[in-house]
Curated annotation (Swiss-Prot):
It holds the Pfam family Helicase_C. Gene3D superfamilies: P-loop containing nucleotide triphosphate hydrolases. Residues 1-228 are annotated as: Disordered. There is a cross-link at K186, K325, K779, K907, K915 (Glycyl lysine isopeptide (Lys-Gly) (interchain with G-Cter in SUMO2)). This is Probable ATP-dependent RNA helicase DDX46. CDD domains: DEADc_DDX46, KH-I_DDX46, SF2_C_DEAD. PROSITE patterns: DEAD_ATP_HELICASE, HELICASE_ATP_BIND_1, HELICASE_CTER, Q_MOTIF. GO terms for biological process: mRNA splicing, via spliceosome; U2-type prespliceosome assembly.
Length: 1031
C-alpha cells in the first residue's frame, strides 16, 4: 500500500499534494495507479529519446555548418564527442545515485501517514530539482555547442563586415571621381557651346524631351536594383540634371554632348519603346538561345528600336545641312589674270588655236581663252620648277583650256580621252586655291576633296599630287577601303589640306568617332574624277551626301573620258553655271594605239594569245582583259602552265595584294597581268605595249578605256580584241570605236554585224545599242524605281544596302515578304462528321444503288465511252482473267483535256463552277462547315529565316497562339532551279475552321521572318565568293 502510493505520488506531483486522496484509494485504484505509473515512465523515456534525438540533430547541423563554412579538423570533432559522452555518463550515474540515496534515506520511526506524506513530498521536490538541474546542464551544453558552431559564423560575419567597409570606401571614391567628371563635363559642354555654330549636326538633330526623360526615370525608380546599380543610376541622374540646366541656359537648338548623356538618353528611349507596347493578348514567349550571353538589360531592348538607333548613328553626319544657319569664311576663287599675249588674240585666232589643239569645243558663257605655256596660267615658281623636274614641257589640249577656266573660279565639266593629262588639269588650280587660304588649325578638315571610283585611281592621283605638295608644304591623305581604318584616322587627325578618297570610305571617316576625325566645313574645292563611272558604279547616294554637306558656294570640277548624256544631266545638279570643255570628240581611242579585231572561235583564243605574247612580250608589258574573276583565275593557271609568269588583278583580291601587284607591274617586276575592268580606269603603266581583250567588251566606253591603257604619253601601243560569233551583239560598239578613231574595220567583223542585224530583223526584234553601265545602284526617276526587281529590293533591305533616302524601309520589307509568300487562299465546305454506326440495308439503300448506277452510265455517256464501256482497271482485269495481254488503255481526248484542266486549275487555285454546284448540292443534304486554308511559300527566303519558322518549337508556339494547324510541305529548290511538274517549292500550309486563326498564324510567321531579316541586316558580314578575302 505504501509502495504503491509512493510511486503514485512520485510520478504525479499534483496529486501528491492532497494526502486525503491517497489514503482513500481502493485496490482497484492502486492497480490503475500502477498502470499510470508505467505509462508515465514510458513517456519520460520517450521524452529523453526525443531530447537526445534533437540534440543529435543540432550536433549534425553544427557539423554540417562547420564543414561548409570553415571545415574544422576532425580531431576536434572527436574530442568534443568524447567530452559530451563522458558528461552524459556522469549525468546518468549522478541521477542513479541520487535516486538510490532518496529511496534509502526514509526514517522508520514515523507513522505511515507522515512517512508517506513526507517521502512523497521529498521525492516530488527532489524530482523537480533534479529535472531543473538537468535542464540547466542541458541548456549549458547546448549553449556551448552553439558557441562552438557559431564561432565560424561570427568569423564569416566579421569578414563580410570588412568587405562591406571596403565596398563603401570604394563607392565613396567613385562618387568623388564622378563629381570631378561632372566638372570636366561642364567644361566640355561650354566648349561645345562656343564652337556650336560650326557643327553640321545641330540643324538635323531633334532635342530630347526633358519631361519624357524625367517620367521614364521615375518608372525606373520602382524597380529593385543592386546597390551598385542604384549608385550608378544616381550618378546618371546628377549628370542628366546638370545637362538639363546647361541646355536650358544655352538655347533651344543645342545638342546634348558627352558619352554619359548619350547613354542615358538611349536607355530612356529604349525603356519607352518597351513600356508603350500594348499587347491585348498574352505575350508569346520564345526560347532565348543566347540567354547566357546577354544580360536582362539587353533583353529589354526592342530590335526595331536598336536597328533604328544604329542606322541613325551611322548616318548622323550624312543628313542634309541647312547652310543658311552656318557662317562660312569668305574665300577667293578667281585667280586668273589674262596675260597681254592672250588678250591680243581675236576670237577667230582663238577658234583656230582650239581647232589645232585636237578640236577643243567649249560650251558656256565667259570661258577664258586657252593658254599656250605654263607661265601663262598664273602658278608659282615652285610649281613651275616641279613641272620642269618631272618632264611636263607644255600643256596638253585639255590642260590649255581647263586650267584657265578653273583658275577663273568657274565650275567645269572636262571631257577628254584617257592619257590626256586630266589629273594635272585639276591639280594645278587646286594648289593655287589652297595656298590663297589660311593654314589649317587643329580640328579643322581639308580644303580640297578629290573623289574617285576605284582605289587604284585614288592611289595614282595621290602619288601625282605628292610630286608638288612636298615643295608647297601641303599634306595629302589617301582615304580608301580595304585597308585598316586606324592609320587613315591618325593621318586625318594630324590634319591634311587635300583628301583623295573613294566615296564609301570617306563617309565612314565623316561618321567615325562622332564626326571628330574630320569634317567638311573648310572644303571649298571638290573634284569628281571619272565622274560618270562613279555614278554608274552606284556611288550616287554617297557622292551626293558628301557634296550636299559642302558649302553651296564651293567650286566643283568633274572630269572623265566618257560622259553620257544621262550622266551629264545628273552632274548639272551639283554644278553652278558650268563650262563644258571637250577635247577630241566624245570617247575616242588615242591615235597612237593600233587596233586589231579578230573574229575567232572560243577554242582557238588561247593559242592566238600565246602567239601574240611570243611576238610582243619582249618589247614591254602586256595586260589581258577578261570579263569575270573566275575567268581571270582560270586564264592565270593556263598561262602559268605555259611557262608565262603572270599575276591576276580583280575585285576579289585583298587590297594589300592589289597594291603590291600594281606596283610590281608598274616597276616591271612582272610584265604580264590578267585583269578585269577594275584595272581599266586610270591605270598608267609605262612601257605597256600590248592590250588584249580576251573577253570582248560589252559596251563602247569599256572598250575605249581598255584600249586607252596603252599608247600613253606619245608612245606606240597595240590593242587586240577577240570576238566570237556568240558575241555578235557587241560588234556594233567595236565598229563604232574603230570608225571614230579612224581605223579600218575588218571585213569579217562587218559581216558578223550585218548577219546579226539580219537575224534580229527576221525575228522582229529591235537592236538596242548598249550604253555601258546603266546606273545600277541609283534611281534616275520614279518610273525606274517602281519597276525595280522585287527580290533584289528585298535582298538590299535585308543586307543593309538600301539608300539613306529610303524612309519606308520597314514598310518595304513587309511588302516584299508578302510578295515572296506568293500566298494561295482556299475556302472549302467540309461535311460535318457523322456517327460511325452503319444502318442496316433497307429498301431506300437499294434505290440509292440504282440511282448510283444510272449516274455512272450517264457519266460514261458524257465521256463518249458508251454505256457498256469500262474504265482502265476493269479492262486490264478482264484481259488478265481471259488470259490475254494487257493492251494500251483507250483514253479519249476529252479525258486528257480534263486532266490538263485540273492541273491548270490546281496551279491557279481555281475551282470550276460545276464542282462548286456539286459541293453545294452535297452540302445541302448534310450539315457542313467552312475550312480556311492558306499556303505561304518560304523557299526563297534566307536559310536562317526558313529555319526560324520551320523549327518544331516555333510551329508549336504559333499553333498554340493562333489555334491553327501548320504543316511544312514541298521541297527546297536553290535559286535559279525551277521545280518539275508535280513538285512544289517548300511552303507552309495553314488550316483552320476560323479565318481569324489563319490570319493570326500568318501574321506571326511574317513577324518572325521580318525579325530575322532585320537581324541579318544589322549583323551582315560580306562573304567572298572568290578565292580571295575581301576587306
Amino acid at each position: 500500500m505504501g509502495r504503491e502510493s509512493r510511486h503514485y505520488r512520485k510520478r504525479s506531483a499534483s496529486r501528491g499534494r492532497s494526502g486525503s486522496r491517497s489514503r482513500s484509494r481502493s485496490p482497484s485504484d492502486k492497480r490503475s495507479k500502477r498502470g499510470d505509473d508505467r505509462r508515465s515512465r514510458s513517456r519520460d523515456r520517450d521524452r529523453r529519446r526525443e531530447r537526445s534525438r534533437s540534440r543529435d540533430k543540432r550536433r549534425s547541423r553544427s557539423r554540417d555548418r562547420k564543414r561548409l563554412r570553415r571545415s574544422r579538423s576532425r580531431e576536434r570533432d572527436r574530442s568534443r564527442e568524447r567530452r559530451r559522452s563522458r558528461s552524459r555518463d556522469r549525468r546518468r550515474s549522478r541521477s542513479r545515485s541520487r535516486g538510490r540515496r532518496s529511496r534509502s534515506s526514509s526514517p522508520g520511526n514515523k507513522s505511515k501517514k507522515t512517512e508517506n506524506r513526507s517521502r512523497s513530498k521529498e521525492k516530488t521536490d527532489g524530482g523537480e530539482s533534479s529535472k531543473e538541474k538537468k535542464k540547466d546542464k542541458d541548456d549549458k551544453e547546448d549553449e556551448k555547442e552553439k558557441d562552438a558552431g557559431n564561432f565560424d559564423q561570427n568569423k564569416l560575419e566579421e569578414e563580410m563586415r570588412k568587405r562591406k567597409e571596403r565596398v563603401e570606401k570604394w563607392r565613396e571614391e567613385q562618387r568623388k571621381k564622378a563629381m570631378e567628371n561632372i566638372g570636366e563635363l561642364k567644361k566640355e559642354i561650354e566648349e561645345m557651346k562656343q564652337g556650336k555654330k560650326w557643327s553640321l549636326e545641330d540643324d538635323d538633330d531633334d532635342e530630347d524631351d526633358p519631361a519624357e526623360a524625367e517620367k521614364e526615370g521615375n518608372e525606373m525608380e520602382g524597380e529593385e536594383l543592386d546597390p551598385l546599380d542604384a549608385y550608378m543610376e544616381e550618378v546618371k541622374e546628377e549628370v542628366k540634371k546638370f545637362n538639363m540646366r546647361s541646355v536650358k541656359g544655352g538655347g533651344g537648338n543645342e545638342k546634348k554632348s558627352g558619352p554619359t548623356v548619350t547613354k542615358v538618353v538611349t536607355v530612356v528611349t529604349t525603356k519607352k519603346a518597351v513600356v508603350d507596347s500594348d499587347k491585348k493578348k498574352g505575350e508569346l514567349m520564345e526560347n532565348d538561345q543566347d540567354a547566357m550571353e546577354y544580360s536582362s538589360e539587353e533583353e529589354e531592348v526592342d530590335l526595331q528600336t536598336a536597328l533604328t538607333g544604329y542606322q541613325t548613328k551611322q548616318r548622323k553626319l550624312l543628313e542634309p545641312v541647312d547652310h543658311g544657319k552656318i557662317e562660312y569664311e569668305p574665300f577667293r576663287k578667281n585667280f586668273y589674270v589674262e596675260v597681254p599675249e592672250l588678250a591680243k588674240m581675236s576670237q577667230e585666232e582663238v577658234n583656230v588655236f582650239r581647232l589645232e589643239m585636237e578640236g577643243i569645243t567649249v560650251k558656256g558663257k565667259g570661258c577664258p581663252k586657252p593658254i599656250k605655256s605654263w607661265v601663262q596660267c598664273g602658278i608659282s615658281m615652285k610649281i613651275l620648277n616641279s613641272l620642269k623636274k618631272h618632264g611636263y614641257e607644255k600643256p596638253t589640249p585639255i590642260q590649255t583650256q581647263a586650267i584657265p577656266a578653273i583658275m577663273s573660279g568657274r565650275d567645269l565639266i572636262g571631257i577628254a580621252k584617257t592619257g590626256s593629262g586630266k589629273t594635272i588639269a585639276f591639280l594645278l588650280p587646286m594648289f593655287r586655291h589652297i595656298m590663297d587660304q589660311r593654314s589649317l588649325e587643329e580640328g579643322e578638315g581639308p580644303i580640297a576633296v578629290i573623289m574617285t571610283p576605284t582605289r587604284e585611281l585614288a592611289l595614282q592621283i595621290t602619288k601625282e599630287c605628292k610630286k608638288f605638295s612636298k615643295t608647297l608644304g601641303l599634306r595629302v591623305v589617301c582615304v580608301y577601303g580595304g585597308t585598316g581604318i586606324s592609320e587613315q584616322i591618325a593621318e586625318l587627325k594630324r590634319g591634311a589640306e587635300i583628301i583623295v578618297c573613294t566615296p564609301g570610305r570617306m563617309i565612314d571617316m565623316l561618321a567615325a568617332n562622332s564626326g571628330r576625325v574630320t569634317n567638311l566645313r573648310r572644303v571649298t574645292y571638290v573634284v569628281l574624277d571619272e565622274a560618270d563611272r562613279m555614278f554608274d558604279m552606284g556611288f550616287e547616294p554617297q557622292v551626293m551626301r558628301i557634296v550636299d554637306n559642302v558649302r553651296p558656294d564651293r567650286q566643283t570640277v568633274m572630269f572623265s573620258a566618257t560622259f553620257p548624256r544621262a550622266m551629264e544631266a545628273l552632274a548639272r545638279r551639283i554644278l553652278s553655271k558650268p563650262i563644258e570643255v571637250q577635247v577630241g570628240g566624245r570617247s575616242v581611242v588615242c591615235s597612237d594605239v593600233e587596233q586589231q579585231v579578230i573574229v575567232i572561235e572560243e577554242e582557238k583564243k588561247f593559242l592566238k594569245l600565246l602567239e601574240l605574247l611570243g611576238h610582243y612580250q619582249e618589247s614591254g608589258s602586256v595586260i589581258i582583259f577578261v570579263d569575270k574573276q573566275e575567268h581571270a583565275d582560270g586564264l592565270l593557271k593556263d598561262l602559268m602552265r605555259a611557262s608565262y609568269p603572270c599575276m591576276s588583278l580583280h575585285g576579289g583580291i585583298d587590297q594589300y595584294d592589289r597594291d603590291s601587284i600594281i606596283n610590281d607591274f608598274k616597276n616591271g617586276t612582272c610584265k604580264l597581268l590578267v585583269a578585269t575592268s577594275v584595272a581599266a580606269r586610270g591605270l598608267d603603266v609605262k612601257h605597256l605595249i600590248l592590250v588584249v581583250n580576251y573577253s570582248c567588251p560589252n559596251h563602247y566606253e569599256d572598250y575605249v578605256h581598255r584600249a586607252g591603257r596603252t599608247g600613253r604619253a606619245g608612245n606606240k601601243g597595240y590593242a587586240y580584241t577577240f570576238i566570237t560569233e556568240d558575241q555578235a551583239r557587241y560588234a556594233g560598239d567595236i565598229i563604232k570605236a574603230l570608225e571614230l578613231s579612224g581605223t579600218a574595220v575588218p571585213p569579217d567583223l562587218e559581216k558578223l554585224w550585218s548577219d546579226f542585224k539580219d537575224q534580229q530583223k527576221a525575228e522582229g526584234k529591235i537592236i538596242k545599242k548598249s550604253s555601258g553601265f546603266s546606273g545600277k545602284g541609283f534611281k534616275f526617276d520614279e518610273t525606274e524605281q517602281a519597276l525595280a526587281n522585287e527580290r533584289k529590293k528585298l535582298q538590299k533591305a535585308a543586307l543593309g544596302l538600301q539608300d539613306s533616302d529610303d524612309e519606308d524601309a520597314a514598310v518595304d520589307i513587309d511588302e516584299q515578304i508578302e510578295s515572296m509568300f506568293n500566298s494561295k487562299k482556299r475556302v472549302k465546305d467540309m461535311a460535318a462528321p457523322g456517327t460511325s454506326s452503319v444502318p442496316a440495308p433497307t429498301a431506300g439503300n437499294a434505290e440509292k444503288l440504282e440511282i448510283a448506277k444510272r449516274l455512272a452510265l450517264r457519266i460514261n455517256a458524257q465521256k463518249n465511252l458508251g454505256i457498256e464501256s469500262q474504265d482502265v482497271m476493269q479492262q486490264a482485269t478482264n484481259a488478265i482473267l481471259r488470259g490475254g495481254t494487257i493492251l494500251a488503255p483507250t483514253v479519249s481526248a476529252k479525258t486528257i483535256a480534263e486532266q490538263l484542266a485540273e492541273k491548270i486549275n490546281a496551279k491557279l487555285n481555281y475551282v470550276p463552277l460545276e464542282k462548286q454546284e456539286e459541293e453545294r448540292q452535297d452540302g445541302g443534304q448534310n450539315e457542313s462547315f467552312k475550312r480556311y486554308e492558306e499556303e505561304l511559300e518560304i523557299n526563297d527566303f534566307p536559310q536562317t529565316a526558313r529555319w526560324k519558322v520551320t523549327s518544331k518549337e516555333a510551329l508549336q508556339r504559333i499553333s498554340e497562339y493562333s489555334e491553327a494547324a501548320i504543316t511544312i510541305r514541298g521541297t527546297y529548290f536553290p535559286p535559279g532551279k525551277e521545280p518539275k511538274e508535280g513538285e512544289r517549292k517548300i511552303y507552309l500550309a495553314i488550316e483552320s475552321a476560323n479565318e481569324l486563326a489563319v490570319q493570326k498564324a500568318k501574321a506571326e510567321i511574317t513577324r518572325l521572318i521580318k525579325e530575322e531579316l532585320i537581324r541579318l541586316q544589322n549583323s551582315y558580314q560580306p562573304t567572298n565568293k572568290g578565292r580571295y578575302k575581301v576587306l
